[in-house]
């Protein structure tokens, strides 16, 4: 009898024990929590864009990206837009494109973290777009296995520099850290790619070539301050890495990686195309793109 009561007691405890929630329920609750966090974090100026910030949660879910990471990216985006209120107007006018820009951050594995400076939200032709920096492109190429290493360097007056081509090509650069490093003393730059096979490729660009691309930049053409004024050497390096990207192997890439690469190169390629046809919008003076 006592044994029967003990069994009944155990059975009752099992019935009362909480059943684990299904994964779908847990995921739904996590998404709801992320939505609440996004809504609560929106400043007054960005509340009309609430749904734009929420929609990319679906992309995060499909890619297996934690909601916490996307909420963090939303916070970075909000900071950028409050700092540059022109972006807010562009996002309100073209909300779908703004959603695409946020999605592109996730699809490429980039971050809008301002301390890392790998990707930004920029206006181009009145539309908010994601753009990668020199460091962003460098990190992507290495992290995705497009190459083992990729780097760009600038050469200044007073430094030893020589290249040799033929059957055994090589490049020699002895920097002078105490030389004058200014736009006036810049001679040019070069990139070096180390492929997965160990093979090395390199090429150079003169200052004149870099300056020719700078002059075609829409931000420079506006006559107002541009990244070429505030971050000249960074822009020179981005010009070089855009050229280097043409030499990266694309065969064997997964469809997802190909899509991400298209996104990363997309804005730079569009601006280069528009530069050639004179179709730049002069109102968008914050774009820091260079020709590929």
Predicted feature descriptions by range:
Residues 35-252:
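Binding-interface segments
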Residues 1-59, 64, 255-292:
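Glycine- and charge-rich intrinsically disordered segments
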């Amino acid at each position: 009898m006592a044994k029967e009561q003990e069994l009944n007691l155990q059975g009752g405890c099992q019935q009362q024990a909480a059943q684990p929630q299904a994964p779908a329920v847990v995921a739904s609750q996590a998404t709801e929590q992320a939505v609440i966090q996004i809504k609560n974090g929106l400043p007054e100026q960005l509340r009309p864009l609430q749904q734009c910030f929420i929609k990319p949660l679906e992309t995060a879910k499909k890619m297996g990206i934690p909601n916490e990471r996307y909420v963090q990216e939303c916070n970075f985006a909000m900071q950028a837009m409050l700092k540059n209120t022109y972006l807010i107007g562009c996002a309100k006018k073209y909300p779908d494109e703004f959603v695409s820009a946020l999605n592109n951050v996730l699809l490429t594995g980039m971050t809008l973290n301002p301390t890392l400076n790998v990707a930004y939200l920029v206006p181009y032709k009145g539309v908010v777009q994601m753009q990668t920096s020199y460091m962003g492109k460098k990190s992507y190429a290495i992290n995705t296995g497009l190459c083992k290493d990729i780097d760009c360097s600038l050469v200044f007056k007073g430094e030893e520099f020589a290249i040799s081509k033929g059957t055994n090509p090589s490049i020699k650069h002895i920097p002078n850290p105490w030389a004058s490093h200014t736009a006036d003393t810049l001679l040019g730059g070069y990139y070096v790619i180390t492929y997965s096979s160990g093979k090395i490729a390199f090429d150079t660009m003169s200052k004149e070539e870099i300056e020719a691309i700078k002059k075609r930049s829409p931000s420079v053409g506006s006559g107002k301050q541009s990244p070429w004024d505030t971050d000249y050497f960074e822009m020179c390096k981005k010009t070089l890495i855009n050229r280097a990207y043409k030499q990266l192997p694309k065969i064997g890439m997964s469809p997802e990686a190909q899509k991400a690469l298209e996104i990363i190169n997309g804005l730079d390629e569009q601006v280069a195309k528009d530069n050639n046809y004179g179709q730049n919008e002069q109102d968008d003076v914050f774009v820091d793109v260079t020709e590929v």
